[in-house]
Amino acid sequence: MNGFSTEEDSRDGPPAQAAPFFGQTCCLIDGGERCPRPAGNASFSKRVQKSISQKKLKLDIDKSVRHLYICDFHKNYIQSVRNKRKRKTSDDGGDSPEHETDVPEVDLFQLQVNTLRRYKRYYKLQTRPGLNKAQLAETVSRHFRNIPVNEKETLAYFIYMVKSNRSRLDQKSESSKQLDA
């Protein structure tokens, strides 16, 4: 679905492509040198090749290799470049000067689906039912980037909580224990 084949997709191929883990290295040439990393289960499909050529990345396939598997590093690199370009062009036309500030990029795709759903529920984000993890992460990250934050107040509160060895979770569990007694 995202341009990378899974292990299940490759089971129908020839035996040389069926098992990417037996000593095979990444099939890509990065900046003129062959990538030495071990191959993962993501394959270098035509869609990925088209994406790389559109982004003008210095990646090419090694023609002497008999498989199309790429390492996890290059898989994540290609996905991140694709996602960054989408974000830059989709947010307010991409040329507004207010987006030029140095905002750290948070990868919410690393969170579990349940965590993303809890975030969506807490902030009452409107989405269509049945979103997959990637769509949910994109919706949440769009909202997350637009939340106004008073940095000074937030940092002061965080430092206070760290110094006092307390958190809201501790307070909730203590209050529930008091109710039980």
Swiss-Prot record:
Compartments it resides in: Nucleus, Nucleolus
Record keywords, A-Z: Disulfide bond, DNA-binding, Lipid-binding, Metal-binding, Nucleus, Repressor, Transcription, Transcription regulation, Zinc, Zinc-finger
Important for DNA and phosphoinositide binding as annotated region, ranges: 85-87
Chain positions of motif Nuclear localization signal (NLS): 83-88
Domain of life: Eukaryota
Region Disordered, annotated ranges: 82-103
Cysteine pairs bridged by disulfides in the record: C26-C27, C35-C71
Gene Ontology biological process terms in this record: negative regulation of transcription by RNA polymerase II; regulation of DNA-templated transcription
Zinc finger (Atypical): 26-74
GO cellular component: histone deacetylase complex; nucleolus
Main location: nucleus
One MF term in the entry's GO annotations: zinc ion binding
UniProt similarity note: Belongs to the SAP30 family.
Assembly: Interacts with components of the histone deacetylase complex sin3a, hdac1 and hdac2. Binds histones and nucleosomes.
Biological function: Functions as a transcription repressor, probably via its interaction with histone deacetylase complexes. Involved in the functional recruitment of the class 1 Sin3-histone deacetylase complex (HDAC) to the nucleolus. Binds DNA, apparently without sequence-specificity, and bends bound double-stranded DNA. Binds phosphoinositol phosphates (phosphoinositol 3-phosphate, phosphoinositol 4-phosphate and phosphoinositol 5-phosphate) via the same basic sequence motif that mediates DNA binding and nuclear import.
Domain comment quoted from the record: The zinc-finger domain mediates direct interaction with DNA and phosphoinositol phosphates (phosphoinositol 3-phosphate, phosphoinositol 4-phosphate and phosphoinositol 5-phosphate). In vitro oxydation causes reversible disulfide bond formation between Cys residues in the zinc-finger domain and reversible loss of zinc ion binding.
Protein name per Swiss-Prot or TrEMBL: Histone deacetylase complex subunit SAP30L-B
